[in-house]
Design a protein with these regions (language model features):
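Conserved functional acidic sites
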Residues: 23-179
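N-terminal hydrophobic targeting signals that begin at the initiator methionine
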Residues: 1-2, 20
Length: 179
């Protein structure tokens, strides 16, 4: 009888762990092949810009504390080079009483080549907060962009096309979910 009960508890714990993990972003997305600078730019733009206007409020929930309201301090999509060439670019800065989060995504092209990059910073506004700063690897999936820290292997930020940021993780392992 004790053996059956033990196996029941073991199976139940496996189910609970599986359910909890299914709510986190996919850790091994299938990359989407982007073939041109325009594809990259459109992908970035749809992730960052649609629901982020300067002055608006966005709310995140960190797993160990109450909701945190951020104000969109800066949001822009595109700039041109000095030669007037269009360069894909998307950037977002959101601030609260406790945090400042900056995300930049950029895609540049020329001479038949394309290049993309990203930068993210999650900085506390007081000394006892966890800070995070890196230039992550960009992974494109069907409807999301994953920013992966190559040093730690963690997905520091996930952006959903047409929505914006849906998930972040700082270097202390705290997860931030958009509400």
């Amino acid at each position: 009888m004790k053996t059956k009960f033990f196996y029941f508890l073991l199976a139940l714990s496996f189910v609970l762990v599986s359910c909890e993990q299914s709510n986190k972003p996919t850790k091994d997305p299938v990359p989407e092949q982007l073939t041109s600078i325009n594809d990259m730019y459109d992908s970035f733009k749809s992730c960052l810009s649609l629901n982020y206007d300067e002055g608006m409020t966005v709310t995140f929930k960190r797993e160990d504390r109450s909701n945190e309201d951020f104000t969109v301090d800066e949001s822009f999509n595109e700039y041109e080079s000095e030669e007037g060439e269009s360069v894909g670019y998307a950037a977002l800065s959101i601030v609260s009483n406790n945090w400042e989060i900056d995300i930049e995504l950029y895609a540049e092209g020329g001479y038949g080549e394309t290049y993309e990059g990203a930068y993210i910073s999650i900085a506390g506004t007081s000394t006892n907060k966890a800070d995070y700063e890196c230039e992550p690897q960009i992974i494109h999936s069907k409807d999301k962009i994953y920013l992966k820290d190559e040093a730690t292997g963690q997905y520091i930020c996930v952006l959903q096309k047409g929505v914006g940021i849906i998930y972040m993780e700082d270097n202390a392992g705290h997860t931030w979910d958009a509400l």
